[in-house]
From Swiss-Prot:
With S4 and S12 plays an important role in translational accuracy. Located at the back of the 30S subunit body where it stabilizes the conformation of the head with respect to the body. It comes from the Bacteria. It comes from Chromohalobacter salexigens (strain ATCC BAA-138 / DSM 3043 / CIP 106854 / NCIMB 13768 / 1H11). PROSITE patterns: RIBOSOMAL_S5, S5_DSRBD. Part of the 30S ribosomal subunit. Contacts proteins S4 and S8. This is Small ribosomal subunit protein uS5. The lineage of its organism: Bacteria, Pseudomonadati, Pseudomonadota, Gammaproteobacteria, Oceanospirillales.
């Protein structure tokens, strides 16, 4: 089930990472699993979740449920971003910039999953610093959520959209 998509209503789900963890006790080790998943509708809503359990399927299901509860709205400009955006979480830094139509998603593993499920089709993206998938996903979603549409910016500044767009 690694890196595959499933339909859950109108939501697409993607498994980003499954990690085996161990708790050391007097009698030996107790193994458990953590799962990182991303959920999106492909048209501007995306979320991520982490699940922990003793069995892989249970961890994945918990992560999917959490991802559905933690969705954010992303302001897109057609199939790309409104403007270049930077974000960081921990030691992971991400930079995403709009790309012309037909470019595709040029981004690394964990970032690619988030961008695909958010509905972005053309973007140039780069991850700097730590490439820990959890922090990269968090930074990517933080950056996407921080974007504002030109209409919102114009309303806040008391200007017209044409003045903002230049």
């Amino acid at each position: 089930m690694a890196n595959n998509e499933q339909k859950g209503g109108d939501l697409q789900e993607k498994l980003v990472q499954v990690n085996r963890v161990a708790k050391v006790v007097k009698g030996g080790r107790i193994f458990g699993f953590t799962a990182l998943t991303v959920v999106g509708d492909g048209s501007g809503r995306v979320g991520f979740g982490r699940g922990k359990a003793r069995e892989v399927p249970v961890a994945i299901q918990k992560a999917m449920d959490q991802a559905r509860r933690n969705m954010v709205k992303v302001s897109l400009s057609g199939a790309t971003l409104q403007y270049p955006v930077k974000a960081r979480h921990g030691a992971s830094k991400v930079f995403m910039q709009p790309a012309s139509e037909g470019t595709g998603i040029i981004a690394g593993g964990a970032m690619r999953s988030v961008l695909e499920l958010a509905g972005v089709h053309d973007v140039l993206a780069k991850c700097y610093g730590s490439t820990n998938p959890v922090n990269v996903v968090r930074a990517t979603i933080k950056g996407l959520a921080s974007m504002q549409s030109p209409e919102d910016i114009a309303a806040k500044r008391g200007m017209s959209v044409e003045e903002i767009a230049g």
